[in-house]
């Protein structure tokens, strides 16, 4: 939770007002809400010297819910490596597309990684409205194969 909060409060602060940042990353965070949300997701973490450098959480149907880097590790390729691991995991299970709701702060990252814009909207978060982007990336090398009538011949 600390990496998430620090990332928003430091790295996204220039994209959002103080009120929006406070609503998006409240202090203290709601631990029960975090546990409930993460329980439904697959999470990949990366550490450096015992510190959480970043994490990514996703569903096997291709929704990338979280991709955050601790500010101490920003601009060092942590998010790119995490994203590559997510994409690899999704390809392995045959997921044809990655989707995400992306913040203003993360939009350029997702553009660089080949995502396409589907829609733009504002979402309400604890009384504040945050601009975000629905984005997707097709994984063209994934083939959906239906296995029928296989025998041991």
Model region roles, listed by residue range:
Residues 2-74, 83-85, 89, 104-105, ...:
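Acetyl-CoA-dependent GNAT
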Residues 40, 63, 96, 129-131:
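Exposed loop/turn and edge beta-strand positions of beta-sandwich/beta-sheet ligand-binding modules
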Residues 77:
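Conserved G/P- and acidic residue-centered "switch" motifs that form tight phosphate/ATP-binding loops
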Residues 90-103:
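Conserved GNAT acetyl-CoA-binding A-motif
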Residues 99-101, 116-134:
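Conserved catalytic-core motifs of GNAT/GCN5-like acyltransferases
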Residues 110-111, 115:
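Conserved active-site tyrosine of GNAT-family acetyltransferases
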């Amino acid at each position: 939770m600390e990496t998430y909060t620090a990332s928003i409060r430091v790295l996204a602060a220039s994209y959002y007002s103080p009120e929006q940042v406070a609503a998006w990353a409240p202090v203290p965070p709601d631990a029960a809400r975090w546990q409930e949300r993460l329980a439904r997701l697959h999470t990949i973490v990366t550490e450096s010297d015992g510190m959480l450098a970043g994490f990514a959480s996703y569903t096997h149907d291709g929704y990338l819910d979280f991709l955050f880097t601790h500010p101490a590790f920003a601009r060092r390729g942590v998010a790119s490596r995490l994203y590559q691991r997510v994409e690899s995991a999704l390809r392995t299970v045959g997921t044809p597309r990655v989707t995400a709701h992306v913040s203003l702060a993360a939009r350029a990252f997702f553009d660089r990684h080949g995502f396409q814009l589907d829609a733009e909207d504002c979402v309400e978060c604890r009384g504040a409205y945050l601009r975000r982007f629905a984005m997707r990336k097709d994984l063209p090398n994934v083939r959906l194969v239906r296995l029928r009538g296989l025998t041991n011949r």
